[in-house]
Amino acid sequence: MRKKLKIAASILCLTLAGSVLAGCGKEEKTVSTDGSTSMEKVIGALGEQFEADNEGVKFTYNPTGSGTGITAVSDGICDIGLSSRALKDEEKSKGLKETILAYDGIAINNENTIDDLSLDDIAKIYTGEIKNWSELGGADAEIVVIGREAGSGTRDGFESITKTEKKCVYRQELTSTGDVITTVSSNPDAIGYASLASVKETVKAVSVDGVTPSEETVKDGSYKIQRPFVLVTKEGTKLSETAQKFFDYATSSAAGAIISKAGAVPAN
């Protein structure tokens, strides 16, 4: 009787072990991305097409902001980080690598009668030197300055280009591109900055130094407030087969039409 029980137990153990090994051998086809909220339209469109072209693949995007996305890939929490600014030297020194996916304009939004601002005007508005729209030929109304939170790639890019780092005086610091657009569209005295790829018809994008933000003016460099959309990976850490396949697809010329349709300028 004991011999039969031992044989049965051995068969059960082998069966369970076989099941575990079979499960381990089956690779889950997933791609996880984390980071910039400005890249939502671009990365969402690429992920959707990648899923459609590759049966059984699950693509995820976590819109946490550029700084958090960079940290996530560094800590091994996601496959690919997303940043709407170039990596800093200290980030590169930690073994992080950037690959430029596309270029995006940072649109300056307002809902009043002002249609054009100089780069100098914009800097003075955000540092508090210009406080009223009447100083720029607009209505007698206090300018409500809206921006992104610290760590945002859009904020870093905007402040770097306008040379206003650590000088901006914000009325509100919001956590996503969508929040900036919604807030500015509901207040005629507000001004904000947002990804050109995310600007909707409900918000007016002013021209800067006479140049209207568009795919063409970002591409030819005449629109000065622009920055890269970056895929962030970690050197020495090999991507899964599925994640590598997505990375190769997203950075190929084949993805160019999708990136353009999403409102950005493809790097390739």
Q: Which functions belong to the PLM regions below?
A:
Residues M1-I11:
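Bacterial N-terminal signal peptides that target proteins for export
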Residues I11-G18:
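Core hydrophobic alpha-helical transmembrane segments of single-pass membrane proteins
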Residues S19-G23:
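C-terminal motif of bacterial Sec signal peptides marking the signal peptidase cleavage site
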Residues G25-G67, T71-C78, S83-N268:
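Exported/periplasmic ABC-transporter solute-binding proteins
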